Regions:
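Small-residue-enriched hydrophobic alpha-helices in membranes
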Residues: 1-80, 90-191
Protein backbone atom coordinates (compact mmCIF):
# COMPACT_ATOMS: atom_id res chain seq x y z
CA UNK A 1 0.00 0.00 0.00
CA UNK A 2 2.90 2.36 0.67
CA UNK A 3 3.81 2.34 -3.02
CA UNK A 4 0.31 3.53 -3.98
CA UNK A 5 0.55 6.33 -1.40
CA UNK A 6 3.89 7.39 -2.88
CA UNK A 7 2.52 7.34 -6.43
CA UNK A 8 -0.56 9.25 -5.30
CA UNK A 9 1.61 11.93 -3.66
CA UNK A 10 3.68 12.18 -6.83
CA UNK A 11 0.56 12.42 -8.97
CA UNK A 12 -0.80 15.25 -6.81
CA UNK A 13 2.49 17.12 -7.08
CA UNK A 14 2.53 16.59 -10.84
CA UNK A 15 -1.09 17.71 -11.14
CA UNK A 16 -0.29 20.86 -9.17
CA UNK A 17 2.65 21.59 -11.47
CA UNK A 18 0.32 21.13 -14.46
CA UNK A 19 -2.07 23.65 -12.92
CA UNK A 20 0.80 26.10 -12.46
CA UNK A 21 1.90 25.52 -16.04
CA UNK A 22 -1.60 26.23 -17.32
CA UNK A 23 -1.81 29.40 -15.25
CA UNK A 24 1.43 30.70 -16.72
CA UNK A 25 0.09 30.35 -20.24
CA UNK A 26 3.42 29.15 -21.57
CA UNK A 27 2.24 25.66 -22.46
CA UNK A 28 5.81 24.45 -22.00
CA UNK A 29 6.00 23.47 -18.34
CA UNK A 30 8.57 21.28 -16.74
CA UNK A 31 7.84 17.60 -16.80
CA UNK A 32 10.78 16.68 -14.62
CA UNK A 33 10.72 14.48 -11.56
CA UNK A 34 7.69 14.94 -9.42
CA UNK A 35 9.12 13.27 -6.31
CA UNK A 36 8.29 14.20 -2.80
CA UNK A 37 6.17 11.15 -2.00
CA UNK A 38 7.16 9.40 1.17
CA UNK A 39 7.04 5.63 1.37
CA UNK A 40 4.65 4.71 4.10
CA UNK A 41 2.85 8.04 4.07
CA UNK A 42 -0.86 7.76 4.58
CA UNK A 43 -2.55 10.80 3.14
CA UNK A 44 -5.79 9.03 2.23
CA UNK A 45 -7.24 8.43 -1.17
CA UNK A 46 -7.74 5.24 -3.10
CA UNK A 47 -6.16 3.52 -6.05
CA UNK A 48 -9.21 4.51 -8.08
CA UNK A 49 -8.57 8.16 -7.19
CA UNK A 50 -4.93 7.81 -8.23
CA UNK A 51 -5.92 6.33 -11.58
CA UNK A 52 -8.43 9.17 -11.90
CA UNK A 53 -5.62 11.66 -11.32
CA UNK A 54 -3.51 10.08 -14.06
CA UNK A 55 -6.52 10.21 -16.38
CA UNK A 56 -7.03 13.89 -15.53
CA UNK A 57 -3.37 14.67 -16.14
CA UNK A 58 -3.52 12.95 -19.50
CA UNK A 59 -6.75 14.74 -20.41
CA UNK A 60 -5.19 18.11 -19.56
CA UNK A 61 -2.49 17.39 -22.16
CA UNK A 62 -4.91 16.00 -24.77
CA UNK A 63 -4.18 18.68 -27.36
CA UNK A 64 -0.44 18.00 -27.12
CA UNK A 65 -0.79 14.22 -27.53
CA UNK A 66 -1.74 13.78 -31.17
CA UNK A 67 1.40 12.31 -32.72
CA UNK A 68 1.69 8.89 -34.25
CA UNK A 69 4.63 8.17 -31.95
CA UNK A 70 2.45 8.72 -28.88
CA UNK A 71 -0.36 6.60 -30.35
CA UNK A 72 1.94 3.72 -31.25
CA UNK A 73 3.93 3.85 -28.01
CA UNK A 74 0.75 3.94 -25.93
CA UNK A 75 -0.64 0.87 -27.67
CA UNK A 76 2.65 -0.97 -27.22
CA UNK A 77 2.62 0.06 -23.54
CA UNK A 78 -0.96 -1.13 -23.05
CA UNK A 79 -0.10 -4.50 -24.60
CA UNK A 80 3.10 -4.82 -22.57
CA UNK A 81 1.21 -4.18 -19.33
CA UNK A 82 -1.65 -6.50 -20.30
CA UNK A 83 0.77 -9.33 -21.13
CA UNK A 84 3.18 -8.63 -18.28
CA UNK A 85 2.29 -11.89 -16.54
CA UNK A 86 2.81 -13.87 -19.75
CA UNK A 87 -0.85 -14.31 -20.62
CA UNK A 88 -3.82 -12.24 -21.73
CA UNK A 89 -7.23 -13.78 -21.18
CA UNK A 90 -9.95 -12.81 -23.70
CA UNK A 91 -11.83 -10.89 -20.98
CA UNK A 92 -8.67 -8.94 -20.08
CA UNK A 93 -8.00 -8.14 -23.73
CA UNK A 94 -11.56 -6.87 -24.13
CA UNK A 95 -11.36 -4.82 -20.92
CA UNK A 96 -8.12 -3.15 -22.03
CA UNK A 97 -9.58 -2.47 -25.49
CA UNK A 98 -12.57 -0.79 -23.80
CA UNK A 99 -10.22 1.31 -21.66
CA UNK A 100 -8.29 2.31 -24.76
CA UNK A 101 -11.24 3.39 -26.89
CA UNK A 102 -12.93 5.19 -23.98
CA UNK A 103 -9.76 7.05 -22.93
CA UNK A 104 -10.27 10.76 -23.57
CA UNK A 105 -6.76 11.36 -24.90
CA UNK A 106 -6.69 8.28 -27.10
CA UNK A 107 -9.93 9.45 -28.70
CA UNK A 108 -7.62 11.73 -30.72
CA UNK A 109 -7.11 8.61 -32.87
CA UNK A 110 -9.50 6.30 -34.75
CA UNK A 111 -10.59 3.43 -32.50
CA UNK A 112 -9.87 0.85 -35.21
CA UNK A 113 -6.24 2.01 -35.45
CA UNK A 114 -5.86 1.72 -31.69
CA UNK A 115 -7.41 -1.75 -31.53
CA UNK A 116 -5.30 -2.97 -34.45
CA UNK A 117 -2.02 -1.76 -32.93
CA UNK A 118 -2.88 -3.02 -29.45
CA UNK A 119 -3.95 -6.46 -30.68
CA UNK A 120 -0.93 -6.74 -32.96
CA UNK A 121 1.38 -6.21 -29.98
CA UNK A 122 -0.60 -8.59 -27.76
CA UNK A 123 -0.47 -11.29 -30.43
CA UNK A 124 3.30 -10.87 -30.79
CA UNK A 125 3.79 -10.96 -27.02
CA UNK A 126 1.73 -14.14 -26.72
CA UNK A 127 3.48 -15.85 -29.65
CA UNK A 128 7.00 -15.13 -28.36
CA UNK A 129 7.08 -13.00 -25.23
CA UNK A 130 10.75 -11.96 -25.36
CA UNK A 131 10.67 -11.02 -29.04
CA UNK A 132 7.29 -9.29 -28.66
CA UNK A 133 8.58 -7.38 -25.64
CA UNK A 134 11.67 -6.25 -27.53
CA UNK A 135 9.50 -5.02 -30.41
CA UNK A 136 7.09 -3.24 -28.05
CA UNK A 137 9.96 -1.53 -26.22
CA UNK A 138 11.42 -0.35 -29.55
CA UNK A 139 8.08 1.27 -30.41
CA UNK A 140 7.79 2.77 -26.92
CA UNK A 141 11.33 4.20 -27.18
CA UNK A 142 10.31 6.28 -30.20
CA UNK A 143 8.27 8.52 -27.89
CA UNK A 144 11.41 9.48 -25.94
CA UNK A 145 12.08 12.39 -28.32
CA UNK A 146 9.30 14.39 -26.67
CA UNK A 147 9.47 14.23 -22.86
CA UNK A 148 5.80 15.16 -22.36
CA UNK A 149 4.72 12.35 -24.67
CA UNK A 150 7.12 9.91 -23.03
CA UNK A 151 5.64 10.62 -19.60
CA UNK A 152 2.12 10.38 -21.00
CA UNK A 153 2.95 6.92 -22.37
CA UNK A 154 4.01 5.81 -18.89
CA UNK A 155 0.88 7.34 -17.35
CA UNK A 156 -1.25 5.52 -19.92
CA UNK A 157 0.41 2.27 -18.90
CA UNK A 158 -0.19 3.00 -15.24
CA UNK A 159 -3.87 3.70 -15.90
CA UNK A 160 -4.17 0.31 -17.61
CA UNK A 161 -2.15 -1.46 -14.90
CA UNK A 162 -4.26 0.00 -12.11
CA UNK A 163 -7.63 -0.35 -13.79
CA UNK A 164 -8.35 -3.66 -12.08
CA UNK A 165 -7.57 -2.23 -8.64
CA UNK A 166 -4.16 -3.86 -8.29
CA UNK A 167 -0.69 -3.11 -9.56
CA UNK A 168 1.02 -6.48 -9.91
CA UNK A 169 4.81 -6.86 -9.65
CA UNK A 170 4.94 -8.04 -13.28
CA UNK A 171 3.11 -4.85 -14.34
CA UNK A 172 5.49 -2.72 -12.27
CA UNK A 173 8.42 -4.43 -13.98
CA UNK A 174 6.92 -3.75 -17.43
CA UNK A 175 6.48 -0.08 -16.50
CA UNK A 176 10.10 0.10 -15.28
CA UNK A 177 11.34 -1.39 -18.56
CA UNK A 178 9.29 1.14 -20.52
CA UNK A 179 10.67 3.98 -18.38
CA UNK A 180 14.19 2.78 -19.17
CA UNK A 181 13.38 2.69 -22.90
CA UNK A 182 12.05 6.26 -22.60
CA UNK A 183 15.04 7.52 -20.57
CA UNK A 184 12.79 8.35 -17.62
CA UNK A 185 13.81 7.34 -14.11
CA UNK A 186 11.24 4.75 -12.95
CA UNK A 187 11.36 6.37 -9.51
CA UNK A 188 9.58 9.37 -11.05
CA UNK A 189 6.49 7.16 -11.13
CA UNK A 190 7.20 5.30 -7.91
CA UNK A 191 8.10 2.01 -9.60
Amino acid sequence: MAMWDKIKDQAKTFQQSQGTRGASGSGQGSHGPVGGGRPGSSSGGSKAQLIGMFKSQLASAKNELKSGAYRDASMAMCALVAAADGRVEPAERQRVEELIVSNEVLQNFPADQLRQRFNQHVDRLLANYEQGKAEALQVIAKAAKKPAEARAVVQTGMVVAGADGSFEPSEQYAIREACTALNIPPSEFGV
